[in-house]
Amino acid sequence: MSRTLTAIAALALSLGGCTSVGQIPPPKIASGTLHSANGAAVGTVVLLAAGDDVAINVAVTGLPPGTHGIHLHTVGSCEAPGFASAGGHLNPHSMQHGTANPAGSHLGDLPNLIVGSSGTGEVTAKLRDSRATAMAALFDADGTAIVIHAAPDDYRTDPSGTSGTRIACAVLQRG
């Protein structure tokens, strides 16, 4: 857990500019608990305000080793076993999928999560939109979920980067 907080703090500080020792850490915007298709808790998601940006940290345990695509999805619902209730990728600007796509990418496109042989993994990133724009999309009337997929995201194939089956999901809760 301390590694997670250190990673979040480092990203938040790099996004938010200089800070002095002892300054209050960036405020948490939202969080969620990731659950597998069988209902087991397999990780956490934390979103932090970082200046005009939003930092996201995903930390997991008990997932299959390998590289997994992760995305923010349009509906704050995680009905197992397939998590189809989470809808498609969060894409308020109607962009193409993938960070390698020259036409731009979805707000919901995130870096792949690498899970080691122990079943643990962690990734921290910055969302693509400003905090004000991201907040409006994340916390609209039906909310937002984050989904972990069985396969890696290739960062370009529309609409989902060939990431495969949805294996874990969390509904983001404000605060």
PLM segments and residue spans:
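Positively charged n-region of N-terminal signal peptides that target proteins for export
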Residues: 1-5
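Bacterial N-terminal signal peptides
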Residues: 6-16
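N-terminal leader/targeting pre-sequences
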Residues: 16-67, 72-175
